[in-house]
């Protein structure tokens, strides 16, 4: 056991020597401290006996004294004055690594520390590593693993502990780190080389190895913040270039030096805290970072402190900062925004737990306002006036003062009218001045109340802090009387009347009342809007009458069976005021519209025609609409059929009964509604030269709904024959024109008691008819009168109009022939005419007894004087009279 301990002590000594080689100091300067920030000591077993030497730490105090007072933070270990670390009692390591701090004091009584790490290596490691306890963690000699004959070597069984080298070393370079040896160097000449980062890979040349001796060296100072660990591979080859060993991995760990100051994440930190905050209230957090090692050293262990506070009122230390977290909180009470709205702190961050390098930053703390000041009215009494009926009228401006921060919830005023149960007033806050603007929320009525005394209370958007009392103001409001417009009662009147309401009848009486009870005013009425001109109003009484027939189906003026008219009432006040009322006439439906088909124009193909759907429309309302009844009239059913398309009988299906000729057809369709209101509508139907559905209709001439081609040819032939007959009669009359003498004598030749007897009937029999009768057709004839004889009253024959149904054309011709035969005025005149009848005997007896004026015999004509005044002239001519 003693030999084993001596061997392990020798190994530790070799490790310590290697560490000294890497920790050379400049001779011209002395900096107190440990030679390394971290010491790593391997232990062969986890069970350590009392007095077991682990290793030795080196401390340079710059005083020349070889011994220094050390102490361990772990009570299980003891550090001698020369830096040797031993186990104080039997110890079992439960972890592969155990770390603790060793502290020492320099000549200025400043405490310094280093970290010691114990690594449990196991038996197989001890077998291949020969370390001196004085050589720290870096062995002086590294041996390639041996391969025993007959055994398969496991590469992972050979573990090389990391080699530590401090960063930022000073002195001459290159410096030896460790020597690498091969067991084959006794058999053959061995040459050594290294590869990896820092050797043949960037950064190239940081580490080199002597080709023959195997010494691994560092060529320049290292920077842990740039590269914290290097992984190299050592190679051993013979003189002919053959590998005598497998490559061995070497890990070089760069130990940290406190060469980086902490850096704040911001130059200026901003935070806020409410005024009046109690001690302990968190305000904000500052943070800093350090690029040094924060795992194995305290070089990045940052501690925060407050260096200064501005202003230092009301206390010097109003805030404190947590050393570890950087959280700034309130230390003492007394924060008042109105006195000190902001504080500026200078915060320091130092590594080595506050003992190392440091830096500073600013922390600006804003004291937030709280509602600790109530708004106050200034002044507290106001007076204003407002005209009645005005809404949103400005009455008065209420002034307040508030010491809280402007434009914050603790400053913004909220006004309330205390004694306003009907909510007739409202106070609006001016966002700029914070003043209260008192307005009317509803129209005031002078006749109801002439003056209001209001109490207005002011508060803030944010609730008061503490026991603050709201301020109150008194406002006196006088209502000014104005002439008010008449008011219709109700403002909208609804009246139901049938649409056939009689013209000139009174519909209703729509009147308004005068709200100004203190004034004696007269109201007149007139219609302001009557788009259909259906109404008129009595200007004195407001009675409304109809002036024209109303129509519910007038879509331009009637919406939803309602006709809207506006009535205005005007008083005679100063100024004149006018009120408006709305009259809603609900027109009750009357069955005044017969149903109509839609569409009325259709096209069918001649071959295999497709049926058409006809929709029945009726603008009336139920029950004056469906179900409808339909019927084809005027013989249309010969060629066409209709049937109902739905159970409600609101649409029809029209289709030809048989194949029809190409052309246009007139179909008479009779439709009747549920109340038997009917109407016959003519449908224009085109039969096209196509099959199935009509795409491009080829039309022919117009064809009657029931006529066939032979019937049409017969009618055309009859018309042609009639035209030829009329032409022949006109030619004949032009050759036999006779000028008739007037039947009565001229006015200047009128003589009493003189008759003309030379008119013998109607002249020649072949000319005794009116030529104008030849131009008459079978329709109604014009009336013929004479001015020489009294007219003879006789019945006018009734001619039947041409039927639309071609099947009735035969009856039409027969009946009209009979009517023509019984018409005495129709040619030819086949009755017996008497030409020698000269009328009955005259009351004046025959004139044949009178002698001619040429007779020589004297005649007595005195009796002519007895015949009266009409024969006086004749008596004077033949009687002689007194002139004789």
Swiss-Prot record:
Quick check: keyword Cytoplasm in the entry? yes
Q: Which residues form the signal peptide?
A: 1-23
Query: Which residues does the entry place in the Extracellular compartment?
Result: 157-709
Q: Which ranges are annotated Basic and acidic residues under compositional bias?
A: 776-786
Q: What is its main location?
A: other
Q: Which Pfam families does the UniProt entry name for this protein? A: CADH_Y-type_LIR, Cadherin, Cadherin_pro
Which tissues express it? Expressed in inner and outer pillar cells of the organ of Corti (at protein level). Expressed in granuloma macrophages (at protein level). Expressed in the epidermal keratinocytes of the skin from birth (at protein level). Expressed in non-neural epithelial tissues.
Positions where Phosphotyrosine occurs in the chain: 755-757
Q: How does it sit in the membrane?
A: Single-pass type I membrane protein
What are the binding positions for Ca(2+) 3 in this chain? 290
**Compositional bias (Basic residues):** 121-131
Biological process per Gene Ontology, one example term: salivary gland cavitation
Q: Which residues carry this modification: Phosphoserine?
A: 772, 795, 840, 842, 848
Residues holding Ca(2+) 2: 259
Q: Where is the composition biased (Acidic residues)?
A: 757-769
Summarizing the function annotation, the protein's role is: Cadherins are calcium-dependent cell adhesion proteins. They preferentially interact with themselves in a homophilic manner in connecting cells; cadherins may thus contribute to the sorting of heterogeneous cell types. CDH1 is involved in mechanisms regulating cell-cell adhesions, mobility and proliferation of epithelial cells. Promotes organization of radial actin fiber structure and cellular response to contractile forces, via its interaction with AMOTL2 which facilitates anchoring of radial actin fibers to CDH1 junction complexes at the cell membrane. E-Cad/CTF2 promotes non-amyloidogenic degradation of Abeta precursors. Has a strong inhibitory effect on APP C99 and C83 production.
How is this protein named in the record? Cadherin-1
UniProt organism field: Mus musculus (Mouse)
């Amino acid at each position: 056991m003693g030999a084993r301990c001596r061997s392990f002590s020798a190994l530790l000594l070799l490790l310590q020597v290697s560490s000294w080689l890497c920790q050379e100091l400049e001779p011209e300067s002395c900096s107190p401290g440990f030679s390394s920030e971290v010491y790593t000591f391997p232990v062969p077993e986890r069970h350590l006996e009392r007095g077991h030497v682990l290793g030795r730490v080196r401390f340079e105090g710059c005083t020349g004294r070889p011994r220094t007072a050390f102490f361990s933070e772990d009570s299980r270990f003891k550090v001698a004055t020369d830096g040797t670390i031993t186990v104080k009692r039997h110890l079992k390591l439960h972890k592969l690594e155990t770390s603790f701090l060793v502290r020492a004091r320099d000549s200025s009584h400043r405490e310094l520390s280093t970290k010691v790490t114990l690594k449990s290596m196991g038996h197989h490691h001890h077998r291949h590593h020969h370390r001196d306890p004085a050589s720290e963690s870096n062995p002086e000699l590294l041996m390639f693993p041996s391969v025993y004959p007959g055994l398969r070597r496991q590469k992972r069984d050979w573990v090389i502990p990391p080699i530590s080298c401090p960063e930022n070393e000073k002195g001459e370079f290159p410096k030896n780190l460790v020597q690498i040896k091969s067991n084959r160097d006794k058999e053959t000449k061995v040459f050594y080389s290294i590869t990896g980062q820092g050797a043949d890979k960037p950064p190239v040349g940081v580490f080199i190895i002597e080709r023959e001796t195997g010494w691994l060296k560092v060529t320049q100072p290292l920077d842990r913040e740039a590269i914290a660990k290097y992984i190299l591979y050592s190679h051993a080859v013979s003189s002919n270039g053959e590998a005598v060993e497998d490559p061995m991995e070497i890990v070089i760990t760069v130990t940290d030096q406190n060469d980086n100051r902490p850096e704040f994440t911001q130059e200026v930190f901003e935070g806020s805290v409410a005024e009046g905050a109690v001690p302990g209230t968190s305000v904000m957090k500052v943070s800093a970072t350090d690029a040094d090692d924060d795992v194995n050293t305290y070089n990045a262990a940052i501690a925060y402190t407050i260096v200064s506070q501005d202003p230092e009122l009301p206390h010097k230390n109003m805030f404190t900062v947590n050393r570890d977290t950087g959280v700034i909180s309130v230390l003492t009470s007394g924060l008042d925004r109105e006195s000190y709205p902001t504080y500026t702190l200078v915060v320091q961050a130092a590594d080595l737990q506050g003992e190392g390098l440091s830096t500073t930053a600013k922390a600006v703390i804003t004291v937030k306002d709280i509602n600790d000041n109530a708004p106050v009215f200034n002044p507290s009494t106001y007076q204003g006036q407002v005209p009645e009926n005005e809404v949103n009228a400005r009455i008065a401006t209420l002034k307040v003062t508030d010491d809280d921060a402007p434009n914050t919830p603790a400053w913004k005023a909220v006004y309330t009218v205390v004694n306003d149960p009907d909510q007739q007033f409202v106070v609006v806050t001016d966002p700029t001045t914070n003043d209260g603007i008192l307005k009317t929320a509803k129209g005031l009525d002078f006749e109801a109340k002439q003056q209001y005394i209001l109490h207005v209370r002011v508060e803030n958007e944010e609730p008061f802090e503490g026991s603050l009392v709201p301020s109150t103001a008194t406002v006196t409001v006088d209502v000014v009387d104005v002439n008010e417009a008449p008011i219709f009662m109700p403002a909208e009147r609804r009246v139901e009347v049938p649409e056939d309401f009689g013209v000139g009848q009174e519909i209703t009486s729509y009147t308004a009342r005068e709200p100004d009870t203190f004034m004696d005013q007269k109201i007149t009425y007139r219609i302001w809007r009557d788009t259909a001109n259906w109404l008129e109003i009595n200007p004195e009484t407001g009675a409304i009458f109809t002036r024209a027939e109303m129509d519910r189906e007038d879509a331009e003026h009637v919406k939803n069976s309602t006709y809207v008219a506006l009535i205005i009432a005007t008083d005679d006040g100063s100024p004149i005021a006018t009120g408006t009322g709305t009259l809603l006439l609900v027109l009750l439906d009357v069955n005044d519209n017969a149903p109509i088909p839609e569409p009325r124009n259709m096209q069918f193909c001649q071959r295999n025609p497709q049926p058409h759907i006809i929709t029945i429309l009726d603008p009336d309302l139920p029950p004056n609409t469906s179900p409808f009844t339909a019927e084809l009239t005027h013989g249309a059913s010969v060629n066409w059929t209709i049937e109902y398309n739905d159970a409600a009988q609101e649409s029809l299906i029209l289709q030809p009964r048989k194949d029809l000729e190409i052309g246009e057809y007139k179909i008479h369709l009779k439709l009747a509604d549920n109340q038997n209101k009917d109407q016959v509508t003519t449908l224009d139907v085109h039969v096209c030269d196509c099959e199935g559905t009509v795409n491009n209709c080829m039309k022919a001439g117009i064809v009657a709904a029931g006529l066939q081609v032979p019937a049409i040819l017969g009618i055309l032939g009859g018309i042609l024959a009639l035209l030829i007959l009329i032409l022949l009669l006109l030619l004949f009359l032009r050759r036999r024109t006779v000028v008739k003498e007037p039947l009565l004598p001229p006015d200047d030749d009128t003589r009493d008691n003189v008759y003309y007897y030379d008119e013998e009937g109607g002249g020649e029999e072949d000319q005794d008819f009116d030529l104008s009768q030849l131009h008459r057709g079978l329709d109604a004839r014009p009336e013929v009168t004479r001015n020489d004889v009294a007219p003879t009253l006789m019945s006018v024959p009734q001619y039947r109009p041409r039927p639309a149904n071609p099947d009735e054309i035969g009856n039409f011709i027969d009946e009209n022939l009979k009517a023509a035969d019984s018409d005495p005025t129709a040619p030819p005149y086949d009755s017996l005419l008497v030409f020698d009848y000269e009328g009955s005997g005259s009351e004046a007896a025959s004139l044949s007894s009178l002698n001619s004026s040429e007779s020589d015999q004297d005649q007595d004509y005195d009796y002519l004087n007895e015949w009266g005044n009409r024969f006086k002239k004749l008596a004077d001519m033949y009687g002689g009279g007194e002139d004789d």
